[in-house]
Amino acid sequence: MAGLGGEPIPDGEFTAVVYRLIRDARYAEAVQLLGGELQRSPRSRAGLSLLGYCYYRLQEFALAAECYEQLRQLHPELEQYRLYQAQALYKACLYPEATRVSFLLLDNPTYHNRVLRLQAAIKYSEGDLPGARSLVEQLLSEGGEDSGGENELDGQVNLGCLLYKEGHYEAACSKFSAALQASGYRPDLSYNLALAYFSSRQYASALKHIVEIIEHGIRQHPELGVGMTTEGIDVRSVGNTLVLHQTALVEAFNLKAAIEYQLRNYEAAQETLTDMPPRAEEELDPVTLHNQALMNMDARPTEGFEKLQFLLQQIPFPPETFGNLLLLYCKYEYFDLAADVLAENAHLTYKFLTPYLYDFLDAMITCQTAPEEAFVKLDGLAGMLTEQLRRLTKQVQEARHNKDDEAIKKAENEYDDTLEKYIPVLMAQAKIYWNLENYPMVEKIFRKSVEFCNDHDVWKLNVAHVLFMQENKYKEAIGFYEPIVKKHYDNILKVSAIVLANLCVSYIMTSQNEEAEELMRKIEKEEEQLSYDDPDKKIYHFCIVNLVIGTLYCAKGNYDFGISRVIKSLEPYNKKLGTDTWYYAKRCFLSLLENMSKHMIVLRDSVIQECVQFLEHCELYGRNIPAVIEQPLEEERMHTGKNTVTYESRELKALIYEIIDWNM
């Protein structure tokens, strides 16, 4: 008989070879050998049993269930195969089939308790929490032949899981913590406890257990290659082995990434995902795929949409997938796609969208065709949320008066959750008037919400923007921009470049030139330090600040100074020329050319020569820089040769020559 690689297996050695492969966890190779053997002896009980075991270990649960189905038909007297089939069906998320198969074992006292545990797990996975609780409590009260410490421990863990699903996170923490103390270190229990802490916003406690899982996994299984992908080491996939599953490393890294994302440490969240044991994309579990899509959306939106759309076709998928896909469609203004997905998946709407999220999405989609109607819908939603916020404010005050720490924490968490729902509604209302350039109305909307939002960074930032846009409220804008900048003053490049630029312009427009210069020196100094630490990294903050200041002077008609500032801001071109910086620069040039063509301004020859030289430099360095970042789901893509800084530089240079000849 031929073995792996075509080498013959000596007579009588086949079974030994298969068992050695299984002993060494080389299940895929064992499957290959067993598959060949079963083609010759399809009714072999040993072959089918080992094949089912290997498939189960490889987490190919549907294939394992098929093997046990065949064994059940060939050997109906051996009821363990019915149990194995039910377990494999459950793991494959085929819950109705698993329930049907397991019911036939309930009357067998040998398997009664194991079947009850399996049925409780099925009901839990289906979302039938009362049914699951009933079975768990039945198990705890009945006991059985395998009753005792282990059974009691499992029961307490199961109760912890039910408490978690019911939203009783503190009680769930107590159950998991007690179970962990009773059992000693177990990765799955540590993860459960970390998840419960995460859901109750105790991130430090959650991270403590996550770090323990990761460190334990690295020590016990260095072969899993934790962190190697982040370090740029080319490593092969470790596959979806049972060992990987037992370490809870994938779950721990996903939870750590979620915590970093919640804390707005987006780079750390992305790095956490690449730290997990390496697997091929087709091997990734749904949660990892979902998190990859979400956390890399800004850099790779097309890929992110593809992953979320793919997940929506899988059963099961992470429950957040449906809502996140719809929200991202709205963020990128694909309202038609959002409406189509809602219409095509009405059955998912009731299961995965809260009434709040459904109403919010409905209003966002309506914005495209009927902004006035959308505003009314959003106003209704905002009114409901403000009532909740006032009620929760009162609850917090009462709890503080009564010195009830538990009630204070609960009310404050509910308040924060409600505020996080209110802010997007408020911003969606404001955006309707922002798009109409009705900035006083936007300001009015924000002022109505000051009672709840005056400490919220997103609210303060947008108030600053709307004051800045009115051009006569620079002093008020400074009052909102300054705290944002000072909060991150020691790491100023963490602040958005446009915020720094707008603050500098506001200083200049209110004759606070010294403050503007001090801020610009601070930005320049930090950029120089960062360039020293990482010479290849492109940093645009100082450049964008200068571009915006140059744009301001151009807008005021001082093109000589404004254009000169724009040109100098992009030096050196290999580090400062990018899609964003080119956007600001070309706007100034287009404004300049428009005014020249209308004979409204006349530039000195030296300035024109400086402009031509600048565009020639952009032409040279802009060959591989997109002039425009295209929307991720556009069907008609721009011509790749035209969507470059080089192409647009040539167009602008040609226009300059045309206008100069015309003037002459």
From Swiss-Prot:
Residues 507-534 form a coiled coil. SUPFAM superfamilies: TPR-like. InterPro entries: TPR-like_helical_dom_sf (IPR011990), TPR_rpt (IPR019734), TT30 (IPR039941). Disulfide bonds: none annotated. It is found in: Cell projection, Cilium. TPR repeats lie at residues 11-44, 45-78, 153-186, 188-220, 392-423, 424-456, 458-491, 543-576. Keywords: Cell projection, Cilium, Cilium biogenesis/degradation, Coiled coil, Repeat, TPR repeat. GO terms for cellular component: axonemal microtubule; intraciliary transport particle B. The keyword Kinase does not apply. GO terms for molecular function: intraciliary transport particle B binding. The keyword Coiled coil applies. One of its GO terms (biological process) is intraciliary transport. Belongs to the TTC30/dfy-1/fleer family. Required for polyglutamylation of axonemal tubulin. Plays a role in anterograde intraflagellar transport (IFT), the process by which cilia precursors are transported from the base of the cilium to the site of their incorporation at the tip. This is Intraflagellar transport protein 70A. It comes from Bos taurus. The lineage of its organism: Eukaryota, Metazoa, Chordata, Craniata, Vertebrata.
